[in-house]
Amino acid sequence: SNTKQPTPLGGVIFA
């Protein structure tokens, strides 16, 4: 499943 995680760079990653 894909979950949105906040990144230190100010974006989001789908992992």
Curated annotation (Swiss-Prot):
Protein origin, superkingdom: Bacteria
Enzyme Commission number(s) from the entry: 3.5.1.5
Pathway assignment: Nitrogen metabolism; urea degradation; CO(2) and NH(3) from urea (urease route): step 1/1
Enzyme class: hydrolase
Subcellular localization, as worded in the UniProt entry: Cytoplasm
Keyword GTP-binding: no
GO biological process: urea catabolic process
Keywords: Cytoplasm, Hydrolase
A GO CC term attached to the entry: cytoplasm
Gene Ontology MF terms in the entry: urease activity
Reaction catalyzed: urea + 2 H2O + H(+) = hydrogencarbonate + 2 NH4(+)
Similarity section: Belongs to the urease beta subunit family.
Subunit organization: Heterotrimer of UreA (gamma), UreB (beta) and UreC (alpha) subunits. Three heterotrimers associate to form the active enzyme.
Name the record gives this protein: Urease subunit beta
Originating organism: Morganella morganii (Proteus morganii)
Lineage: Bacteria, Pseudomonadati, Pseudomonadota, Gammaproteobacteria, Enterobacterales
Gene assigned in the entry: ureB
